Amino acid sequence: MKKILLLLLLPILSFSQTLVPSSVHIYLDQYMSETSWDIKDTTGNIVAADGPYYNAVNYQSMIIPVMLPAGNLTFTIYDSYGDGLNGALWGGLDGSYYVKQCNDTLVFGDVPNFGFDTAHAFGSDACPPVLGCMDP
């Protein structure tokens, strides 16, 4: 009976998706309510999204923890005004953005004048094991 139950559950277990702890770092300019972002899989499904940041303060750092599936993904950041995170254009400070996973930076957004949006393709994968003795 246990073998039959295991055989029935095996297809369900084999389709379970590996989720990897990650984080999206958004360093806003002074027009924070214009900024939003999403992460999509290869079929266009949104797997994570946030913004616009109506309640943020100028230049606030937003660190959003997300669980991302393993595989190829696309991070897209949006600016509803069309000047990106280019706050210096209007006498302020520029913003930036990053996607991090397993202490690696997968998306590095240091060009603030991206217009209405910009997309970055990246690969998400399980974190490698930490090597070495873990006993104190």
Show the residue positions of the predicted features.
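Residue-level recognition of alpha-helix boundary/capping or hinge positions
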Residues: M1-P136
